[in-house]
């Protein structure tokens, strides 16, 4: 069973959804037969590098709310993260462009380090408050994932390397009508949108395992719940 996951490294629900999927796979009897592949998706391909404006300030400006209201909104997401053992430091996050991070993740996949790189990039942004567009930071992250500095610099210093791989992933998402992430595709036939509860993922895995081949392409197993996902404009805030 192959699961393809479209996500962005600055999408909080992508990290939460990743953890919930991992929990579901751990509970799944056929877990040894499950392969997970991460796909690139930029929430904002035109995003600038970090300018000093934090996530709470950016959110407040976007929605016309106070900083305190923005903080409370993010606290709700942080609570969901905590439920799966994650710590989100919204006060220190540095929103930025993620294209180079995606290129580096694509390279990591070619040397068998996709899983490690994906986790390190997400943790670096959400928990460690690192600037994941900065090349020095990316070199450091790659080293912790087991990739040599020289290899990383060879990718980062040539903006064409793995750029097409990222664009292909994004084009595939567009063809499927994906407008928000995380977005999960199982065996190129079934889809799950958003950071669904662990039990939803577990049931989906079991259903696909039992019914593989009997369902139409990209059958939606999200249960009608389209919340807990980020679009190219925002991460939805209930009531706004």
Features from the language model and the residues they span:
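C-terminal cap of thioredoxin/glutaredoxin-like
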Residues: 5-7, 13-30, 106-110, 116-240
